[in-house]
Each structure stands twice: as C-alpha cells, then as structure tokens.
C-alpha cells in the first residue's frame, strides 16, 4: 500500500522506465492515435508530462485487434527499429539481449518492443459475462514470441493439458518435435535473420489458422451451450477436447511450415513456386528452379560506403611470361 497520498496510482507502477513505457505508448498509439501523438514527446524525452495509467480506445476492440497488438514492434512509428543498422539487411524488428550496451564509456539501449524473442508464452484473455463461465472464458494462448506463434483457444473449463504444452518430452535444455515451445522457436529462429524475405510465408499460415479458429468459435460455443444445458460435464469435456485439438493442429501445421521454409530458402537462395503454392520441382536433374535475391539494394549501397573499393571487381595484374 502506498502511504504517500500525494503520489498518483500510476507512480506505483514504476513510471519512467523507458523500456516499459515505450511499450505502453505503442498500445495507446495503436488504439487511440490522438493519445499516441500527445505522449510521443514524453517517450522521446522531450516532455515531462507522463502518460495516464489507462485510456479509452477510439473504437471497440476485437480479440484479433489485441492479438495483432501483441505482435507490435513499433512499425510505422518514430520508434520503428527496422530501418537502422541494427535491423541488418532484412529489416528484422528484433534486437539481441541485453537491453543496454556500452560504446566506450557511454551507455546505450536497444528498443524493447511489445513482441520479443525471449517470450516464453503469451495470451489474450477473452471474458464474456453473458455466457456460462465454462464457455465464456477463453485464453487465446501461444508459446514463444507473440509475433511468430499461433493464438489457439484454451477454454477456461479445460481440465487436460494438450500434449504439446505439457512439457513431458522437453524442457529448457531438451528439444522435442512434440513440444509447442520448441517448434515455434525452431521456425522463428529460421525467420529472424532473413525476416523481410521470409515473414510473409509464416504470416499466411498463421492467419489461416487463427482465422479458422475465430470463424469456428460461434459454432463451437453454440454446440457447447446445447450440451451445457443438458449436461455441463459433457460440455466441459467437449471444450477440453476442442482446446487440445486446436493446439495440436497448430503444431502440426507449424512443423509443415518449418519443413517448407528450410527447403524454399535453403542456402540463401529462394526456390520458385508453382501456381498451386508448392515448390517447383526440377524437370531434369536435382536442382530446383530458384532465384538468388542476394542483399537488398539499400544494404549494398551502405556496404560499399563503408568498405570503399575493398570489394570492387577488377582484373588481377599478371606479369608477362
């Protein structure tokens, strides 16, 4: 309990920690642009007026809105980190830990966006008072980084843990192909180094799964409600089975995604795609049709500026024999 009544409630929640305040600002900015504009100077250190503890969004938010917000890296704002040298050639919105570093005697920091690679698990809680508790509470849950996981539904009445979440076969030093945590990490760690090149392939699978779960929700809950009116135990069993099924189906899809990515982007080249979304097979031999995208133009220009004529192609001088 704070005994100093002169302090505001927000002060109790450790104001002025830049790493955390920027994340709060980003949420505010996404859901109320006017508030975001007002407090940008505070985040940039140009104003001493702190942000409020909470705000009213400019519109009603959906579960999908909040899921998208959990994946934010300040893209499209003055805090965007995809356009400085730390992003590398493929504009990764991630920075390696630790949060701070020194050059000489001066200390600097890395931005800490809402979505970070070291996340263990993430969720969006959906609570609806107009439904029985067993049906009205859903935890949209994913393991690892929110940006590159799948938010699958776990109903609050569930009394069984999906095998892929259980940790039976894996821990922090033991990889398992049956572990959601390790499968999501496996795919994410492939994508981050070539983020702008590979992220769209991941996003297509992610959106398909999450759209499927969202579109199925009303029907699933209608069926659960019919069961609940007759036998609440059967309704809870039904929703538990559904929660386990969606978690496992997401992991099955993610394994296939990982297999697809390692083939398509093998060794820095990109294999060509057929109209049906499969990788083109070679007509003869063992080399599939591919392109070599190399590095982006902007990166190459900066490379030449930094290295001068170090990599300039020239003919080696050969003495006459």
Locations of the language-model features?
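A compositional/structural signature marking long, glycine- and acidic/polar-rich segments
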Residues: 1, 5-7, 41, 89, ...
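Long, charge-rich alpha-helical interaction segments
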Residues: 11-31, 35, 39
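Substrate-recognition/cap regions that form aromatic- and gly/pro-loop-enriched pockets
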Residues: 101-215
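Helix N-terminus capping/helix-initiation residues
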Residues: 15, 50, 61-63, 144, ...
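Single conserved hydrophobic/aromatic residue that forms the stacking wall/gate
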Residues: 2-13, 317-321
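Axial heme c-ligation environment in periplasmic c-type cytochrome domains
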Residues: 47-55
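Extended, compositionally biased non-globular segments
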Residues: 54-133
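Histidine-centered catalytic/metal-binding microenvironments
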Residues: 205-319
């Amino acid at each position: 309990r704070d005994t100093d009544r002169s302090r505001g409630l927000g002060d109790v929640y450790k104001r002025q920690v830049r790493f955390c305040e920027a994340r709060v600002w980003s949420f505010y900015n996404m859901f109320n642009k006017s508030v975001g504009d007002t407090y940008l100077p505070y985040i940039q250190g140009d104003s001493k007026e702190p942000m409020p503890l909470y705000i009213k969004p400019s519109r009603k938010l959906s579960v999908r809105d909040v899921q998208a917000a959990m994946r934010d890296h300040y893209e499209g704002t003055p805090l965007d980190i995809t356009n400085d040298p730390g992003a590398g050639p493929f504009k990764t919105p991630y920075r390696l830990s630790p949060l701070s570093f020194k050059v000489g005697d001066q200390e600097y920091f890395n931005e800490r966006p809402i979505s970070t690679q070291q996340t263990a698990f993430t969720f969006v809680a959906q609570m609806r008072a107009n439904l029985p508790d067993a049906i009205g509470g859903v935890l949209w849950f994913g393991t690892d980084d929110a940006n590159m996981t799948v938010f699958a539904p776990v109903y609050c009445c569930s009394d069984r843990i999906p095998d892929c979440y259980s940790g039976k076969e894996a821990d922090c030093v033991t990889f398992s192909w049956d572990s959601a945590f390790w499968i999501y990490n496996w795919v994410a760690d492939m994508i981050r180094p070539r983020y702008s090149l590979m992220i769209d392939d991941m996003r297509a699978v992610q959106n398909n799964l999450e759209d499927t779960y969202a579109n199925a929700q009303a029907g699933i809950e209608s069926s659960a409600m019919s069961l609940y009116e007759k036998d609440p135990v059967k309704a809870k069993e039904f929703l538990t089975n559904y929660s386990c099924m969606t978690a496992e189906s997401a992991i099955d899809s993610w394994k296939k995604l990982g297999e697809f990515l390692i083939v398509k982007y093998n060794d820095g080249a990109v294999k060509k795609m057929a109209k049906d979304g499969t990788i083109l097979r070679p007509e003869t031999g063992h080399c599939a049709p591919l392109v070599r995208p190399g590095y982006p133009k902007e990166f190459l220009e900066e490379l030449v500026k930094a290295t001068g004529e170090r990599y300039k192609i020239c003919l080696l001088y050969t003495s006459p024999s």
